[in-house]
Amino acid sequence: MKTVAFTTLGCRVNQYDTDAMRGLFIQKGYEPVDFDSKADIYVINTCSVTNMGERKSRQLIRKAKRTNEDAYIVVTGCYAQLAPDAIAAIDGVNLVIGTNNRHKIVELVEQLETTEKQINAVRNIMEQATFEEMPLYGNEIDKARAFMKIQEGCNNYCSFCIIPYTRGKLKSRRVDDIKQEAQRLVDHGYHEIVLTGIHLGNYGVELPGRPNLAAVVKELLTIDGLERIRLGSIESVEVSPELVELMATEKRFCSHLHLPLQAGSDAILKAMNRHYTLDEYKELIRNLRSRIPGLSVTTDIIAGFPGETDELFEETLNTVKEIGFTHIHAFPYSKREGTPAAVMDNQVPEAVKKTRVALLNEQGSLGLQTFAANLVGKPAEILIEREEDGWYEGFTNEYIHGRIKKGDTEYQIGDIVGGTVVSVDGEFVTIA
C-alpha cells in the first residue's frame, strides 16, 4: 500500500482542505502516515498570509525531499496559488495545485507516475464561481472536533491582505451539502463541529435564495447527537441579530465568537480598509455581552501596520484593556507584495512590531485570567481532546482550556464531560 503524508500551515480552512484531501487518498487505498515518516507522497498545504508562512512552506518542501528523495512532492494552498512558478522551481517539487482543482489531487499524482513530468495545475482562481466540493466522511480526521468549511473566497480586499487574490471570489456551499456532511461527522462520533470559511459572515450572499449563516446553524441544530456548534472567525459587521438570538437561546451554539479587531484606532482601521469604526465594534461587544452573559470574545490584531505611531498603538492597547479579550492572536504586520499597504509610507521597524506584539499578548493573558476567574463556582463542560498526566484536557463551551482529574469513570477522546469550575491553574480551569 502506498503511503501519503500531509502537513498544513495557516488557518482552519487550510486544515479542512488537508483533511478533505487526505480523505480522497484514503478512498483510493493510500495509507496516511506522519509527515516525519518516510512516505511515497508528501502533500504540503501552504499559507501566504505572511512572509513567515511562505518561508516555512519552503522549508517543509525541502524537509520532505530530504526525508525521501524518491517521493512525489505535492504543494498546494495559498502560496502555491500565488507563486506557482517559484514553487515549481524548488528542487523536488513534482506537482503544484493552487486553491482549486484539489478534488483531482489523486488523479494528478497518479498521472505523475505515468508521465514522470512535473505538473503545474494552478488555474486562475478568479474564474472559479462555485464552491469546490471535497466532502469529509469522518475517517480522515484525527481530532476531537471537526472543522467544516462552508464558504470560500473574500471580496473585502483589506489593504494588508493577499487572501482575496489566492482564494478568489465569494463561493458558498449548499445548505443540503453542509447538513449531509455534518450528519456523516456526527455518525462517525464527532460531537462538536466548527463552521469555517474565508469570509464566513458573508455565507450565502451569492446562492439562490440567499441563505445566511443563521439558516445554516438552525439546520444543523436539527441533527441528533450534535452537541456543539462553534463559529470560526467572523467579521463584527456580519454578526446578525438572528445569530445573536440563536447564541443567546440555544445551549448547543457555543458562547464564543472570534471577532477580528485588527486595530484599536480609527485612523489605522481606515487605512486597512476595514468596514467598521472602533465605536461600532465596541457597541457590538456591549450588546453581545448584554444579550449573552458569559460570552467569550477572541480576536486578531496586527501590530505595526504602516503609519501606526506610538500614540496610535496606545489607542489599540487601551481598546484591548477596555474590551478584555479572552485570547488575542497578535502578529506583526507582514508586507505582502501586490497589496496597497505594501507601498504605504511610514513602514514600522521590525523591532517595534515585536515589542508591540509582546504587549498585546500580555494583555491577552490578563484578559484570559480575568475571564477564567469569573468561571469559578459555575458549571462547565469540556470536550476531551487528550489525556495527560492523570488529567482529561479540552476546551469549554467558551473555548477556555479546561481539565478534569481522571477517576474511576473512563472517558474517550471526543466525549463531553462536565462539573463545576473549582480553580484556575495556569492556563487551565479545573473542573470537579
Language-model segments: which ranges?
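Terminal RNA-binding accessory module
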Residues: 343-432
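Short, electropositive alpha-helical surface patch
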Residues: 208-221, 241-255, 308-325, 350-354, ...
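Radical SAM/AdoMet-radical enzyme domain recognition
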Residues: 187, 214-215, 219-223, 228-229, ...
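Conserved strand-turn element in the central/C-terminal portion of the radical SAM core barrel
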Residues: 157, 161-168, 228-237, 263-274, ...
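Generic beta-strand/beta-sheet core signal
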Residues: 7, 196-198, 232-234, 260-262, ...
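Hydrophobic, well-ordered secondary-structure elements that form the walls
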Residues: 259, 300, 320, 328, ...
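Residue-level signal for the nucleotide or nucleotide-sugar donor/cofactor binding architecture
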Residues: 100, 173, 211, 238, ...
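Proteins enriched for Cys/Gly/acidic motifs involved in redox and nucleic-acid/cofactor modification
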Residues: 1-203, 218, 242, 253, ...
